[in-house]
Amino acid sequence: MATATRLLGWRVASWRMRPPPAGFVSQRAHSLLPVDDAINGLSEEQRQLRQTVAKFLQEHLAPKAQEIDRSNEFKNLREFWKQLGNLGVLGITAPVQYGGSGLGYLEHVLVMEEISRASGAVGLSYGAHSNLCINQLVRNGNEAQKEKYLPKLISGEYIGALAMSEPNAGSDVVSMKLKAEKKGNHYILNGNKFWITNGPDADVLIVYAKTDLAAVPASRGITAFIVEKGMPGFSTSKKLDKLGMRGSNTCELIFEDCKVPAANILGHENKGVYVLMSGLDLERLVLAGGPLGLMQAVLDHTIPYLHVREAFGQKIGHFQLMQGKMADMYTRLMACRQYVYNVAKACDEGHCTAKDCAGVILYSAECATQVALDGIQCFGGNGYINDFPMGRFLRDAKLYEIGAGTSEVRRLVIGRAFNADFH
């Protein structure tokens, strides 16, 4: 396996994180607690990858996270994306020949975790770009498509997205209505997509559409297309004003006689459901790094706060109830880490199951929401004030119980997997 040093090459120095000094009580947005990766079972190269990425993000992203959330805008998105490209993390699972790093899903999860630790919103946009778009092209694109799109997506010159959901087709995604009609060497797309992460910014999008409206079952009539910004008939609506993940731009996509070359089919005509479902398992796995990062961010802020804030003549972290909160938050995070990391390792070894890809994001997402709530409680009144980041962590965490398949759908996936063993 390529080392983190080889991954980053000449692009950055090899940084090492150090444990915080005794008496560490920083209240800055980018204060860090050490992560014990000996317990997490990471190799030396994977630990170095985390340390390098974390240092870069805590310097260049974390101090901006509150303003990104408040304004619902990341003003330097394009510049930052190119920095991520220079760092080598946008194409972390892509082959080296296209500019990628040629690493695995565990490394992808680690980067997703650290970006989300610095900013949940930017972490979500990273996941949509690096996994939903780039990784789909890597896994399903032909050579011409890979050569055309991957280098610019991996360098950060282009921003990528994926579009499945529609206003009336979320969990029931195969009921989509976006229609693609073949005319000569092109397809004409008509319809809408909704809730599309990176939609307002994307230069390249993987879009699913119906090419056979009469197919039974309906899933047999879906095709995946590569759509580019600027194609005639393709436009985006205004970005949505969301509860959380603010600054990760989301919008509706509009297709009005949009002309897409037949050469832009990803995979095969009417076989898009295979691209969709196999990609969804890996999407759930990689996005599970998001809740891990949010939980770590809650701890990064809460643990120091509990050892600064005083009540009744002592630090509130010495109260038994607050010690209980710290223990609950920490053990939830560590249990989630072991599950996510081990499923990622299994996928890297060729053993990837829908049941456990659903399981890791189900469990980590619900734990992240609870950890964020516990963090708010530890902060008391300050936790309810937007000058502190605790509310942002909660609003960001809740998204992971909804996106990439709701918690309810994930439970169905797991339950059906067991039922299939007893048919």
From Swiss-Prot:
Localization per record: Mitochondrion matrix
GO molecular function: 3-methylbutanoyl-CoA dehydrogenase activity; flavin adenine dinucleotide binding; identical protein binding
Transit peptide: first to last position: 1-29
Catalytic reactions of this protein: 3-methylbutanoyl-CoA + oxidized [electron-transfer flavoprotein] + H(+) = 3-methylbut-2-enoyl-CoA + reduced [electron-transfer flavoprotein]; pentanoyl-CoA + oxidized [electron-transfer flavoprotein] + H(+) = (2E)-pentenoyl-CoA + reduced [electron-transfer flavoprotein]; hexanoyl-CoA + oxidized [electron-transfer flavoprotein] + H(+) = (2E)-hexenoyl-CoA + reduced [electron-transfer flavoprotein]; butanoyl-CoA + oxidized [electron-transfer flavoprotein] + H(+) = (2E)-butenoyl-CoA + reduced [electron-transfer flavoprotein]
Named cofactor requirement(s): FAD
Residue ranges the record marks as coiled coil: none
Binding residues for substrate: S171, S219, R220, Y274, D281, L282, E283, R284, A404, G405
Active site location: E283
CDD domains noted in UniProt: IVD
InterPro entries: Acyl-CoA_DH_CS, Acyl-CoA_Oxase/DH_mid-dom, Acyl-CoA_Oxase/DH_mid-dom_sf, AcylCo_DH-like_C, AcylCo_DH/oxidase_C, AcylCoA_DH/ox_N, AcylCoA_DH/ox_N_sf, AcylCoA_DH/oxidase_NM_dom_sf
EC number from the UniProt entry: 1.3.8.4, 1.3.8.1
Residues involved in FAD binding: 162-171, 195-197, 309, 320, 377-381, 406-408
Signal peptide feature range: none
Pathway participation: Amino-acid degradation; L-leucine degradation; (S)-3-hydroxy-3-methylglutaryl-CoA from 3-isovaleryl-CoA: step 1/3
Membership in a protein family: Belongs to the acyl-CoA dehydrogenase family.
Function, in words: Catalyzes the conversion of isovaleryl-CoA/3-methylbutanoyl-CoA to 3-methylbut-2-enoyl-CoA as an intermediate step in the leucine (Leu) catabolic pathway. To a lesser extent, is also able to catalyze the oxidation of other saturated short-chain acyl-CoA thioesters as pentanoyl-CoA, hexenoyl-CoA and butenoyl-CoA.
Protein name: Isovaleryl-CoA dehydrogenase, mitochondrial
Species this chain originates from: Pongo abelii
Top-level taxonomy: Eukaryota, Metazoa, Chordata, Craniata, Vertebrata
